Amino acid sequence: MKPAGPFTRELWTTVQPVYEQIINCLFVRRLTDGTLPRKWFTYYLSQDVLYIIDDSRALAVTAARAEKQDEMYFLLELAKDGLDIERSMHDDFIENYTIPEAPEKSPAFKAYADFLLNNAYYSPYPVAAAALLPCFWVYYKTGEYVFKNAIDNNPYRKWIDTYSGNEYIQYTKRFIQITENLGQKTNHIIRKQMENAFTKGAKHELSVFEEASKQ
């Protein structure tokens, strides 16, 4: 998944070290080689079920603040249809793995959800969008890495396939392009805030994997 222009290229360059940490963290390495403990995966998935509700809410709030109608419609579509992709995968694993419902969000997932919602409500619209982008771009890149390196008959293949599917790719490409456009037309102060939000979002992606591997 390539950047859409100079601004998103700069964003990815900034976050590249965090991405390297993600694909080399214990959770992702063991997901890739098929040795991920079931306990870690069920913990992660039970938390992710709660997280995507707030992620969807943050997308909807950000959509309401969009300056262009096409961006508003896209973010609303993403809040529903894009996350339906994840819910379908969650439902399948929950049914087959008998995953218990988490009573509340864990510290790492709560911090991530709060970060997205705070930006959605209170940051300038371009910054809110940049904060949400890692949930798709970094997640896609991580899934792409796992897909290319996963062993045959990986027990978590459905999770892996979800984030390398064409529908998820198209949503992510469009989101990157929107962020590129927003970065190109705004001032340097907002661009810096967008960069900071994107980096923090990527770090939250890392933190939820690290938390799951400590269970």
Residue ranges and their predicted role:
Residues M1-R9, L31-T42, Y121, N154-T162, ...:
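Short, charged, low-complexity loops and linkers
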Residues K2, D70-Q170, T199, K203:
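Active-site-proximal alpha-helical scaffolds that flank and shape metal-associated catalytic sites
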Residues K2-R9, V15, Y19, F115-N118, ...:
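Hydrophobic alpha-helical segments
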Residues W12-L36, D55, I176-K185:
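Short alpha-helical hairpin
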Residues Q16-Q21, T35-R65, I85, A130-Y140:
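Alpha-helical bundle segments that constitute or directly flank the non-heme di-iron/ferroxidase center
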Residues Y43-D54, E77, D81, Q193-K200, ...:
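A non-catalytic, amphipathic alpha-helix used as a structural packing/dimerization or gating element
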Residues A150-Y156, E180-K192:
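Acidic interhelical loop/turn segments
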Residues Q184-Q215:
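Long hydrophobic alpha-helical segments typical of transmembrane helices together
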